[in-house]
């Protein structure tokens, strides 16, 4: 894990770093030097691939993946990793699926929002799900808007459909 692309994250420091993969690393993307320069870097004579994942390292060496840097929500100067919040929302026994994303906000740049679907027969509402999650995060990490939907929007391959989810929250 490299926080600034030049040195390793100190275990137990709480620093967030980019996951870098060494070893057999490609020379670059075909006819895309800009993307190649962002993804493949040489540090101290070794070549690394930076795939976009962010993580921390615990004092015992355990790596905690936080999520994709490109999905990170900057809200009032604080960084929120949606995948981390989604997993916490899904800890509620009634929540079947969840997506968290940023929506534009005049005051904070972005605000955290999300959608959840409830298990069949479940009766939880958005407030109950948020209350159960509140003890796990700082207030800026929690969705300011959380909408309960019949099905969380996903592509046929299971990937999150953030565009559709944002549209649901923008126009409930």
Per-region residue spans from a language model:
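Residue-level recognition of short loop/turn positions
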Residues: 2-6, 45, 59-60, 94, ...
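Hydrophobic "anchor" residues
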Residues: 7, 63-65, 160
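Conserved beta-strand termini and adjacent loop/short-helix elements that scaffold enzyme active sites
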Residues: 1, 101-103, 149
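AMP-binding/adenylate-forming catalytic core of the ANL superfamily
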Residues: 22, 27-28, 38, 47, ...
């Amino acid at each position: 894990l490299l926080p600034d692309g030049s040195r390793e994250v100190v275990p137990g420091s709480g620093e967030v770093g980019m996951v870098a993969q060494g070893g057999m690393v490609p020379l670059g993307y075909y006819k895309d030097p800009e993307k190649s320069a962002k993804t493949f870097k040489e540090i101290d004579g070794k070549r690394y691939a930076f795939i976009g994942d962010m993580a921390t390292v615990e004092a015992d060496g355990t790596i905690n993946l936080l999520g994709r840097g490109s999905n990170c929500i900057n809200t009032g100067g604080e960084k929120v990793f949606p995948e981390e919040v989604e997993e916490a929302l899904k800890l509620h026994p009634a929540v079947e699926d969840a997506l968290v994303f940023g929506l534009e906000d005049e005051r904070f740049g972005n605000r955290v929002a999300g959608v959840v679907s409830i298990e069949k027969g479940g009766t939880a509402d958005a407030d109950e799900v948020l209350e159960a999650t509140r003890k796990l995060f700082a207030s800026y990490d929690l969705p300011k808007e959380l909408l309960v939907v019949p099905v969380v929007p996903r592509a046929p391959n299971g990937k999150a459909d953030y565009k559709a989810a944002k549209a649901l929250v923008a126009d409930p």
